[in-house]
Amino acid sequence: MEFPDHSRHLLQCLSEQRHQGFLCDCTVLVGDAQFRAHRAVLASCSMYFHLFYKDQLDKRDIVHLNSDIVTAPAFALLLEFMYEGKLQFKDLPIEDVLAAASYLHMYDIVKVCKKKLKEKATTEADSTKKEEDASSCSDKVESLSDGSSHMAGDLPSDEDEGEDDKLNILPSKRDLAAEPGNMWMRLPSDAAGIPQAGGEAEPHATAAGKTVASPCSSTESLSQRSVTSVRDSADVDCVLDLSVKSSLSGVENLNSSYFSSQDVLRGNLVQVKVEKEASCDESDVGTNDYDMEHSTVKESVSANNRVQYEPAHLAPLREDSVLRELDREDKASDDEMMTPESERVQVEGGMESSLLPYVSNILSPAGQIFMCPLCNKVFPSPHILQIHLSTHFREQDGIRSKPAADVNVPTCSLCGKTFSCMYTLKRHERTHSGEKPYTCTQCGKSFQYSHNLSRHAVVHTREKPHACKWCERRFTQSGDLYRHIRKFHCELVNSLSVKSEALSLPTVRDWTLEDSSQELWR
């Protein structure tokens, strides 16, 4: 029998115990702030605390966090998440929460913060683009309004009934943003073989005094592109009213009955573009031309609603263009599926030929493997794994959002480089000043970063935690052990290594020191 609410009830009880200080067995210090918590909860939610307590569980009652990286409000928010499973940013900057989560190796929170920063950057970019489009459209309306008086003299004659049928599928007269006499519509490439379309387009071009795009300049199917009647306010304001054309007098009545449903409005599109001179030789549209947005055409709309309003001679072209479009989409999706797979196979082949996973597997004790959850690399000790994890969250790998104009951005006073938070700025300033704030109490040697000091401390303690499995020699640094193995035991390691499937580690063999020594002397 299962109790679905058991986990929620357990977290609630642990949260109450933390607030009461009951059974709290550790204290986390962030600057001057103190946080009482339970080691089991911290180690379960953070890889940093897991590696911190792994070797010396009983000797580490107090945990000091770097206040330059982790702020007290950000850690309080992450601590609430550990006990309640809810993340509420409130008024905290996302950059501070991202820096704290990266330092504590809380990967789920890092992904959420990066996603929010990316959405924020996308929103700001979209708003900026809309403002630019609105300004460019208003300028185009002013330039196009100067020639609107010539429209009345260029009205098509009664013999252009085929061209009027094509225009009858347009949802509204306001959706056509075209310069007078320069309006052209994209026709299917197969339309060159249809005499009706070509014969009716030429008289209209002669009467208007301009060149209408012939079928050879079309690149998309007319039936595949119907007019989108739902537009942004900026797009609606920048289009021209073509009501001066007498041949379009019946369009409004047709639109009221045809576009009565909002679903049909959103599903149908036709693309109408503006250019000064359209000819068979021109295939590119300049960046200043106004391009109307279009969305994906639904199958149900194209099958049930749009077909009955198309001209009869365009029906076979519509079916052919739909089939060609579906084939192109299938090929594109196949290419997208093939590319990551091929890249992954190359990566797997490189990992199989690498010696590091096998050496790391042999170096660690039987049954203990310290694997990076992000890149699947293996390390001989939790300390080296912790140092490696910090490389995944370097400054250049983070996603940076464009800060608002009224926000004080951390900026270097010497080189003018900007940063997302104060920690990265302080770390960068050390490159200019040469400051080394971390000093060894034994010899007085200084270091720029705390992990370098921790690595140096082993020199004074004379500890040699890294042992060779075959000759019983011990080393202070893991790099010395790797060089020793490559120099003396490389052939033996290759003979013992068994390649497994891609991205999987080789099985650990139980070799005693006596067996390995005999193997060396053979």
Curated annotation (Swiss-Prot):
Composition bias of kind Basic and acidic residues appears in 121-143
Q: Which Pfam families match?
A: BTB, zf-C2H2, zf-C2H2_4
Q: What is its main location?
A: nucleus
Residue ranges of every copy of the BTB domain listed in the record = 24-91
Q: Where is this cross-link: Glycyl lysine isopeptide (Lys-Gly) (interchain with G-Cter in SUMO2)?
A: 273
Positions of modified residues (Phosphoserine): 157, 516-517
Query: Does the keyword section mention NAD?
Result: no
GO terms assigned for molecular function = DNA-binding transcription factor activity, RNA polymerase II-specific; DNA-binding transcription repressor activity, RNA polymerase II-specific; sequence-specific DNA binding; sequence-specific double-stranded DNA binding; zinc ion binding
Write out the entry's keywords from A to Z: Developmental protein, DNA-binding, Isopeptide bond, Metal-binding, Nucleus, Phosphoprotein, Repeat, Repressor, Transcription, Transcription regulation, Ubl conjugation, Zinc, Zinc-finger
Source species, domain of life:
Eukaryota
Which SUPFAM superfamilies does the UniProt entry name for this protein?
beta-beta-alpha zinc fingers, POZ domain
Q: Which Cys-Cys disulphide bridges does the record give?
A: none
| Record GO biological process | cerebellum development; cerebral cortex development; hippocampus development; homeostasis of number of cells; in utero embryonic development; negative regulation of DNA-templated transcription; negative regulation of transcription by RNA polymerase II; neuron development
Segments forming C2H2-type zinc fingers: 370-392, 410-432, 438-460, 466-489
Gene Ontology CC annotation, any one? nucleus
Job description of the protein:
Transcriptional repressor that plays a role in various developmental processes such as myogenesis and brain development. Specifically binds the consensus DNA sequence 5'-[AC]ACATCTG[GT][AC]-3' which contains the E box core, and acts by recruiting chromatin remodeling multiprotein complexes. Plays a key role in myogenesis by directly repressing the expression of ID2 and ID3, 2 inhibitors of skeletal myogenesis. Also involved in controlling cell division of progenitor cells and regulating the survival of postmitotic cortical neurons.
Family label: Belongs to the krueppel C2H2-type zinc-finger protein family. ZBTB18 subfamily.
The name of this protein is Zinc finger and BTB domain-containing protein 18
